[in-house]
Amino acid sequence: MSILSVKNLEKKFGDLTVLKDISFNINDGEIISIIGSSGSGKSTLLRCMNQLETITSGTITIDGKTLVETKNGTPVYAGKDVLKEILMETGFVFQNFNLFPHYSVLRNVMEAPVCVAGVPKKQAEKKARELLKKLGLETKADAYPCELSGGQSQRVSIARALALEPKILFFDEPTSALDPELTGEVLKVIKSLTDLNITMVIVTHEMAFAKE
């Protein structure tokens, strides 16, 4: 069953067309890699599917809910409640981590469940600690982002994305900001997530990893 559907997607920045007539379906539980040359619109496509960029035209459906569709040549987005539902069903791992620098690792992972989903703090903390343990970060719960290595920061970013128990996880070049020796560390973590049966869409330049 298709959990993510994109139809005739177009995205322009002014007169520059970045995405043109993009259509595809991704089934529940699939792991898909998006590869292409730098500047080809891979990250923009991911951002369009995750409500971080508005589209120019087309239709995006996530888990049976229409995120956006084109009516009379204009993209029309779903209402606030549906957008929130979709947001809580998707997680996004950024190139540059995007952690809150003034929050501890634990609070970074807890923040969305508590503030967006309304999960009680004790429950959110329990889940956050479980995720940090799974990703080998249980000893870093009270540390701050400035005290972490790049690989550790990216693992915290992955834990944060998993905290809302999303159905789809988007990775935008998850190793691009890392030193070469840390790349394997993060790729190993991503591979370990396959047992969670989460649909994953990964933008990457790591061709060997994409093949796996």
Question: What does each of the following model-derived ranges do?
Answer:
Residues 35-37:
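The feature captures the beta-strand-to-loop junction immediately N-terminal to the Walker
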Residues 204-205:
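H-loop/switch region of ABC-family ATPase nucleotide-binding domains
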Residues 180-182:
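Helix N-cap at the start of a conserved alpha-helix in ABC-type nucleotide-binding domains
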